[in-house]
Amino acid sequence: MIRNNKSKDKIVIPEKLRSDVIDTIPKVLELCPIPESIDITYIKDQVKVYMEGRQQFYIETGRNPYIEDEFSEYWIAKASKGKQIGKGSCGMDVKTHKNEGIDVMCVVMNKGISNEKSLMQNFSSAGKNLDTLFTEKKDIEALTLFTEEYISKIKKTQLNNNLSDLYILSFISTKKNIYMICLKLYIDRINNVKSSGFTEKLKNIKTEYFIDSKIGDIRLYKSKKRLELRLKNNIIYDTNIVNLYTIE
């Protein structure tokens, strides 16, 4: 028997594409249970009342239901026996009775991805240099400008309001449901965030390791001078999600 000693070429997967490597890198935002300080039953009751006068409108127009920011922040403050602290440029909206900081967001899920939530916007210091860095294709420097500003903003909020753990609490609307999901914010992990390059038309910069790419996407936008979070549809299948309301 003649043996073929020619070995098959081994396919090497680049390290940055290997899921086992990516998954071990701690993210700045990670899914977690709704904090125990928040009374979920209270939130459900408030959403039910809110929707009573609106449900028929959403059914007839085919639009997704939407929770207005002013209501959601007020509800979370009441449900946590806390208070609203987010007026102005504060990095959090609510301080719970357990001294947790909650940044509340309300988004609509459309075609697999939500509309945006602004994490950081700057038209002055960092914003002035952003156009130049985009023109020079310096994505790392541009992203660093905004992540450093974000760290400063959050840590200042945490210190001034004596906050412990920090969270982003999201109301997510689909055609039929309103959900609530929580992301824990680990601000000290922001150094893990990397640029994954510009989009084709150089309008924004994609990021890695800010959030698991299966559940969300965070980009820096040139025109808006803003770091934005969008959630992906996969997030509504997470075990920590709470269904607040269903349109019958």
Give a label for each model feature.
Residues 2-90, 96-97, 106-248:
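Nucleic-acid endonuclease domains
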Residues 103:
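Redox-cofactor binding/interface segments in oxidoreductases and associated redox assembly factors
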